[in-house]
Amino acid sequence: MGCGLRKLEDPDDSSPGKIFSTLKRPQVETKTEFAYEYVLLDFTLQASSNPEVIKINSILDIVTKVEDYYLKGYIVGAIHPVIQPVGQRKHLPASCLYRVVLSRLKLSPKNSAAPSGQRRPRLVIEECPLTSEAQTNDAAKELIEKINFAAKRGMKFVGFISQPYSPYKFCNGTNHDGDIESMLHVRHSSDENCRSWNEGTLSGQSSESGIEEELHHESGQYPMEQNGSPSSSKSRKGEASDNKLYTVFNAFDDDSTSWTYQEGILSMKVTRKGSVISTLDADWLELTTFYYKQGLSLIDSFVFWETSKGEHLPKSLEGFFIYEEEGSGVPGSSRKGNDAIVVEQWTVIEGCEIKTDYGPLLHTLAEFGWLLTSVLPTPVLRHDSEGNLATKQIVFLQRPVMWNSAAQTTDKKASRRIKGEDKNKATSRSIGLDTTTPQPAESRHPPEECRLSPSRECWTKEGRLAQHNSFSGFSSSDSVLRELDDGQFDQEDGVTQVTCM
């Protein structure tokens, strides 16, 4: 089933990611009543010579930067750091990059008016200090209580986002607190710093340990402070003395509608090189499908990436997904369930700019009514063959179940509860160093032709497809998503689609 684990030394292993879905490929490309339009904005806490990367001094600045898009009907659907800035990764220039995904409904030819009851919200970002220590149960309970309390006031949860207290300390490897002259020097040389990470001695390496060695060398010249070092357990998201945690909402002026939020299981197996996480294993659909089929939306995730200094390094990571249930008065709240797509994406960073990402795929799926609700960045890093930094991201999309579509049958067994023995039976798939050369994306704007990739069909270095007798994808045909062979996916057996991109 699926791609399985693939040999890292395979010279032709150049897959930029995988796709998992609760649907057959023809159903994925079935047109729905509505489609979406997306805008992807990149922000940085550093100066950048690229005008498309927006400079901010704080996460809070994003609110004013997206106001014009809200006037045009867009809303923020997801916000996330480009890489997961844990451990020495805080010193990477890419740790200062943030992605904001905005969406709005695109009316189909069948409909000439927006759905009734649609209201225009405003973006709100609030600091969210945690009073309890960042342990799974305590943090989950406290965070869920906070966002449920806000939801009663017409605040629709978007996600959590963290920012280092001293961004220049982590983005550039130095601390310029109170030193204006040094700060200006950092702003002037930020692009040079970005290039040095990509054009240094590690250019062309795909070794995780090589990346960590460079980080360790660069950061070793700075003294480590007790409880404030990059490797300290205090750098956990939400609790860190060197991090601020923010909560992002879409706020509505009235509280006539409400949402409720609950947690769900998130457990991942990991492999490490020393203390560094090099691969992650998780069956995303096994963990989430039950909630999707109940009509819930996966909004965000909260993972405890780091352990206290001196503690045993675990072989699994725990956290939780945050799911949203729409209350009365919300348009579309009567729908019975959601189908899902999960994408394991290698995102490539050239200098301080994103070169390859999930944008082209997102614009393609938008035409078929797929809504991006969450992106989980991971600490898994590598260099591609060109020496650019690549990081693994997990992208979650959903669409209401099309009960009346003749092309779709309901998956009866995929909604089983993930608890007890079912949880232990979850099949894991490697999403770590399973590729060597991620393929470059086109523009982050909708491409003229964006093609999905086939299951177990992986790109060769010559750009050809190596067929492994599974379903189709990235093609040159008129259809963006080629049809699957009928016998290769049995929804009644609860088998999920897997695609190598």
From Swiss-Prot:
The keyword Isomerase does not apply. Keywords: Cell membrane, Lipoprotein, Membrane, Myristate, Palmitate, Phosphoprotein. The keyword Lipoprotein applies. Residues 1-20, 196-238, 407-454 are annotated as: Disordered. It is a lipid-anchor. It is found in: Cell membrane. A lipid is attached at residue 3 (S-palmitoyl cysteine). InterPro entries: Raftlin (IPR028169). One of its GO terms (cellular component) is plasma membrane. A lipid is attached at residue 2 (N-myristoyl glycine). Disulfide bonds: none annotated. It comes from the Eukaryota. The modification Phosphothreonine is found at residue 409. Residues 410-425, 442-451 have a biased composition (Basic and acidic residues). Residues 224-233, 427-440 have a biased composition (Polar residues). Pfam families: Raftlin. Belongs to the raftlin family. Upon bacterial lipopolysaccharide stimulation, mediates clathrin-dependent internalization of TLR4 in dendritic cells, resulting in activation of TICAM1-mediated signaling and subsequent IFNB1 production. May regulate B-cell antigen receptor mediated-signaling. This is Raftlin-2. It comes from Pongo abelii (Sumatran orangutan).
